[in-house]
Amino acid sequence: MERIKELRDLMSQSRTREILTKTTVDHMAIIKKYTSGRQEKNPALRMKWMMAMKYPITADKRIMEMIPERNEQGQTLWSKTNDAGSDRVMVSPLAVTWWNRNGPTTSTVHYPKVYKTYFEKVERLKHGTFGPVHFRNQVKIRRRVDINPGHADLSAKXAQDVIMEVVFPNEVGARILTSESQLTITKEKREELQDCKIAPLMVAYMLERELVRKTRFLPVAGGTSSVYIEVLHLTQGTCWEQMYTPGGEVRNDDVDQSLIIAARNIVRRATVSADPLASLLEMCHSTQIGGVRMVDILRQNPTEEQAVDICKAAMGLRISSSFSFGGFTFKRTSGSSVKREEEVLTGNLQTLKIRVHEGYEEFTMVGRRATAILRKATRRLIQLIVSGKDEQSIAEAIIVAMVFSQEDCMIKAVRGDLNFVNRANQRLNPMHQLLRHFQKDAKVLFQNWGIEPIDNVMGMIGILPDMTPSTEVSLRGVRVSKMGVDEYSSTERVVVSIDRFLRVRDQQGNVLLSPEEVSETQGTEKLTITYSSSMMWEINGPESVLVNTYQWIIRNWETVKIQWSQDPTMLYNKMEFEPFQSLVPKAARGQYSGFVRTLFQQMRDVLGTFDTVQIIKLLPFAAAPPEQSRMQFSSLTVNVRGSGMRILVRGNSPVFNYNKATKRLTVLGKDAGALTEDPDEGTAGVESAVLRGFLILGKEDKRYGPALSINELSNLAKGEKANVLIGQGDVVLVMKRKRDSSILTDSQTATKRIRMAIN
């Protein structure tokens, strides 16, 4: 107070004021401080001081022709005095106002296109809903999040090439645009930005925002998709949160979400097939997400999720070195261990062979709803510090950590036999057996674990076997913390290998992922997922299997037809008929198959009984291993719509209906396609005898010249092919047989072959 009073007194004297305002600052140190270097030392002061002057701005001389000397209010806009030390004019801030109001205008058409990400953000915020603010402790954990909504997923390099191509097309430098997405984006942007007057550098910056995923490692409680991250500063503080619903979705979040759903479906389906790895690859390569090939998305998208990482590993891509157990991502932060097989006895005296980790190790465990720090020694949990959204989530984390610790009291807590199986009916490995057992019921585990008194440590409390908090005692080694555990921040990726059962290992042989780790959570994808593989037909239920099977036969009828007559066994073994088998009642599969195969054989043997519609209708039933029986059927049952429905062997039914007039097939009322031929063949006396010694190959093929008459055929050499005119002006392609021994069968097959070739 004294000092302030003294200063007041001093300022009241005019001499003081004069000294402070008029005299020069001539202390060398001060002058040096403020004048050395180009860097402004006190920008805020400088700005205030400059703006207090009449003409703080300098401009090019041309401005004098473009702006009047005075505005409508008669205020001077620029001074006739030149700027000292340069050839520029001194200009008033009022000139800027005049220019903004009366200056030349330019086309604004490109602004929304260039600043697309900003315009879209404004729309999202305009339509978003902000709810009430709640004050509570925020358990935030740092996660790697996407901070840039609405981007494509190009790598930095690939985006750079696109930007150069769009903004500086004439610049030198080798640019090769390879991927589908690069080419599409380049074409699109070139059209959008024709005659764009915005500074190229600005356009380049904006394009980068649109093309590249930018991630940051940020503390988050709640939603992690990019439309939530862009308002992170509005929705969560240290002790408060504000509810928010985004006013729009962005494609990159939808891609991430749909990719996870597609990957989970594919891994689940692959697990139950004969060769899981081959099936998984086949499905990844034939699936599209929002019209983009899934394999292209996998190459570019950094999403880390168990199923997605299994698909990446199968494609030979690198993945994160952390491993997954019980739905938690484990990352070893210190220590090391060697692995040794050991046999242990459960509480039910069942013998389990487990791979024991020998040695001291520390891990971080990160799940969707809980996180933890785990310190363990050989088959012993030393300490577990866990934090989570609620009791349930905390319990999940504790169970996983207890099982992972491999402690004896955990193994002894098993009641009953362990015989959990996966989707393919194979027994799970012992660690997952234990996990499933305690996830079902952990009461005995928690009861037998043991409790200990605890010290009062800030931010930590104990937890009792019934999962209620306590400040006195806690489960041995377990504490609950208010603070979350950060996700592993590194984006390092490692080379991994995958076996045919989809177990992913690092180069040291540690299992990082296996299908048991893939979540069973079902969700609805935001983007359309198109699975072209027959293995995924059943994902939409039995009806879809039925329709898809028949559609497939009709689409591929040309080749199916030839295989039906020449190599039926190969046709019956096609994987496209696999899903259909699940619709046929188990007890009847073999009998139906035997019956249909016999029927088909008769068609092949007896002239003129070839019936396209009937072959298509019954073909899927012939795929099961046949039982030899004398059974005859007039209808075959399939299980759809929750009950058995009948397919009539001769004639139409609601399940399989062929309309002769329109030549279209409907399956369960859904259109399954058109038959391009006339299936009503009846019998036709074909010149079978004449065609002995010739093999009918199929339809006319113009490359083999004009059609010969049957008499001209005798001139052909063995193995030579020709088109030949038969019967009612139909032309087929034939080849003269190389051996005479097979001539006998020709007259029988010729009839069928000709009929098929004509059709």
From Swiss-Prot:
Keywords: Cap snatching, Eukaryotic host gene expression shutoff by virus, Eukaryotic host transcription shutoff by virus, Host gene expression shutoff by virus, Host nucleus, Host-virus interaction, Inhibition of host RNA polymerase II by virus, mRNA capping, mRNA processing, Viral transcription, Virion. Pfam families: Flu_PB2_1st, Flu_PB2_2nd, Flu_PB2_3rd, Flu_PB2_4th, Flu_PB2_5th, Flu_PB2_6th, Flu_PB2_7th. It is found in: Virion; Host nucleus. The keyword Chaperone does not apply. The record marks E627 as: Avian adaptation. Influenza RNA polymerase is composed of three subunits: PB1, PB2 and PA. Interacts (via N-terminus) with PB1 (via C-terminus). Interacts with nucleoprotein NP (via N-terminus). Plays an essential role in transcription initiation and cap-stealing mechanism, in which cellular capped pre-mRNAs are used to generate primers for viral transcription. Recognizes and binds the 7-methylguanosine-containing cap of the target pre-RNA which is subsequently cleaved after 10-13 nucleotides by the viral protein PA. Plays a role in the initiation of the viral genome replication and modulates the activity of the ribonucleoprotein (RNP) complex. This is Polymerase basic protein 2. It comes from Influenza A virus (strain A/Turkey/Ontario/6118/1968 H8N4). The gene is PB2.
